């Protein structure tokens, strides 16, 4: 599922985005944010974060730098 969502975003970046003027108010762009969010948090939470970000992309939001939040869970190594 993760790979499929990333491929859809990459298709958008390659074929649709070049046809429109640059208008993203954020860094990284919303599509780059979506890919990073899905890679970092998985398909469900990453998609949620990407949609939440896209909904903030409008003329009344100041934009700016908005990095993908770090993963909150940590994996514990078992020690012998």
Swiss-Prot record:
UniProt keyword Cell membrane, yes or no: yes
Listed GO CC annotations: plasma membrane
Source taxon at top rank: Bacteria
Main location: membrane
Topology of this chain in the membrane: Peripheral membrane protein
Keywords (A to Z) from UniProt: Cell membrane, Membrane
InterPro entries listed in its UniProt record: Membr_insert_effic_factor_YidD (IPR002696)
Cell membrane keyword on record: yes
Any one Pfam family match given in the protein's UniProt record, by short name: YidD
Localisation: Cell membrane
Family note: Belongs to the UPF0161 family.
HAMAP family referenced in this protein's UniProt entry, alphabetically: UPF0161_YidD
Role noted for this protein: Could be involved in insertion of integral membrane proteins into the membrane.
Protein name: Putative membrane protein insertion efficiency factor
């Amino acid at each position: 599922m993760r790979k499929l969502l990333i491929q859809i975003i990459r298709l958008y970046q390659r074929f649709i985005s070049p046809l429109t003027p640059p208008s993203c108010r954020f860094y990284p762009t919303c599509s780059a944010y979506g890919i990073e969010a899905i890679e970092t948090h998985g398909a469900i939470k990453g998609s949620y974060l990407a949609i939440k970000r896209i909904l903030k992309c409008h003329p009344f939001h100041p934009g700016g730098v908005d990095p993908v939040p770090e993963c909150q869970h940590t994996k514990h190594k078992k020690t012998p």
